[in-house]
């Protein structure tokens, strides 16, 4: 049953997650930067040409990036922000190419990148060499096969859903592929990927490797707007049965059944990055004996709540979205009688509900906090930390002694130390002592690449509250 609280919070939203791995050694080949605009630049270019730096002609397409960006790329990063593009020469400004060679200010080749003229991330490196579109398509197919191959061992009788490709973390910037049971969802999040050739290559690899019932492209409207892209066709990219309907299906995580709708929900539809943490919350509640009453705050479609319902007698899920809570109820019913707990859903603002309930003296054996990203930019970190502290303060006042608190942040810009400091400050204000049991991140199908810090965004603290 869904209850309505008077105040409504933000819906649970997450920023797209694009990441990337360690790079190979930079080539010493050179490209000539665009014709200089100042006498000093001309002198430097002349010195370079006298040194024997052969390369592309001045009219050839190519991007010249700042020293800061070049150093980042050489350390293994894959992004160049628009502010670090010193100059760019295009064959046709009206129709920018998908790929451009990238060089430093001396003309040394750094690689080939997807080009996004309207995005803050202007260049996404796909190779450390100079390659053309045909080579890129074959390289993309090879990397996608490798990414899928790394995930196959993660799929078993308990789990038939996972992230098959995680963008930069699998050396495929802007490419997201998620598997939900028999359905595969594709997201293409960069302008340079918006082509029939790219879609056909992805579909071919996914058909051969996974034999799905359907492959559907699900756009991220916000990202496509930033990239200056129109919405793709709503028709499936591929169907095993031409007459089949693929809008909805079911998938399994940790043995539990979940509803999936390709036309609803956030991100690609579910939060697969948390699936290992769902099981960890359940297991820690059992170990601590925190099996009475549990609370899942910002519960979305019930991931933590349903796992806690395996070991707790009563579970309450709170979210701002009625549509999400309706799916959570479907998920609950699909797992009866395995889940014997009493479960109820409350629609409303997490901050208001926690404030009201903590003031009223409510108590729980286990509480999970999984709010949306509070800091989508560095300038928002200070406010985000206040939000994390407030949520944790209210939760800590309600956790019974010896109970469990699982608190999460999906804000990349909020680091581990900052999150832990916010929780420690909340514990001090609540006059509670907390013991850190585990630091957890995203599930293994969302790997972190150390050369690309942006791939680490999800942080999960498992705490025993005294």
Language-model regions, residue ranges each:
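Cysteine-centered catalytic environments shared across enzyme families
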Residues: 133-135, 139-160, 185-235
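Non-catalytic accessory regions of SAM-dependent methyltransferases
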Residues: 1-181
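Short, surface-exposed beta-strand-loop junctions and turns on beta-sheet-rich folds
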Residues: 119, 192-193, 266
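Rossmann-like S-adenosyl-L-methionine
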Residues: 239-466
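Non-catalytic substrate-recognition/targeting regions of SAM-dependent transferases
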Residues: 165-178, 198-271
């Amino acid at each position: 049953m869904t209850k309505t609280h008077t105040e409504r919070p933000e819906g649970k939203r997450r920023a797209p997650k694009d990441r990337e791995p360690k790079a190979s050694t930079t080539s010493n080949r050179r490209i000539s930067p665009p014709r200089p605009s100042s006498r000093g630049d001309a002198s430097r270019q002349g010195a370079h040409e006298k040194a024997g730096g052969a390369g592309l002609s001045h009219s050839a397409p190519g991007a010249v990036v700042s020293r800061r960006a070049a150093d980042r790329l050489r350390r293994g990063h894959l992004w160049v922000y628009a502010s670090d593009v010193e100059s760019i020469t295009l064959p046709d400004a009206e129709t920018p190419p998908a790929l451009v060679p990238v060089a430093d200010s001396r003309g040394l080749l750094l690689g080939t990148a997807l080009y996004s003229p309207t995005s803050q991330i202007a260049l996404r490196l796909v190779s450390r060499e100079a390659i053309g579109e045909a080579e890129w398509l074959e390289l993309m197919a090879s990397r996608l096969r490798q990414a899928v191959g790394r995930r196959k061992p993660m799929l078993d009788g308990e789990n038939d859903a996972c992230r098959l490709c995680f963008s930069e973390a699998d050396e495929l910037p802007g490419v997201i592929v998620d598997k939900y049971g028999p359905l595969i969802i594709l997201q293409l999040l960069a302008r340079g990927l918006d082509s029939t050739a790219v879609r056909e290559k992805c579909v071919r690899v996914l058909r051969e490797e996974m034999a799905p019932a359907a492959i559907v492209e699900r756009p991220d409207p916000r990202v496509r707007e930033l990239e200056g892209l129109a919405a793709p066709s709503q028709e499936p990219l591929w169907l095993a049965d031409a007459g089949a309907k693929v809008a909805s299906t079911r998938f399994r995580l940790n043995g539990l059944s979940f509803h999936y709708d390709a036309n609803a929900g956030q991100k690609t539809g579910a939060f697969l990055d948390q699936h290992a943490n769902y099981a960890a919350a359940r297991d820690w509640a059992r170990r601590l004996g925190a099996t009475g009453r549990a609370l899942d705050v910002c519960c979305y479609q019930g991931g933590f709540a349903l796992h806690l319902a395996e070991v707790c007698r009563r579970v309450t899920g709170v979210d701002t979205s009625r549509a999400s809570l309706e799916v959570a109820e479907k998920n609950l019913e699909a797992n009866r009688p395995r889940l014997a707990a009493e479960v109820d859903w409350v629609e409303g603002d997490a901050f208001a509900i926690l404030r009201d309930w903590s003031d009223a003296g409510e108590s729980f054996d286990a509480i999970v906090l999984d709010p949306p990203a509070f800091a989508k930019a560095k300038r928002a970190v200070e406010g985000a930390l206040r939000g994390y502290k407030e949520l944790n303060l209210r939760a800590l006042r309600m956790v019974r002694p010896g109970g469990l608190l699982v608190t999460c942040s999906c804000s990349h810009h909020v680091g581990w130390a900052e999150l832990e400091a916010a929780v420690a400050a909340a514990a001090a204000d609540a006059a509670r002592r907390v013991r850190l049991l585990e630091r957890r991140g995203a599930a293994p199908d969302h790997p972190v690449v150390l050369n690309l810090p942006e791939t680490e965004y999800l942080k999960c603290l498992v705490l025993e509250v005294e």
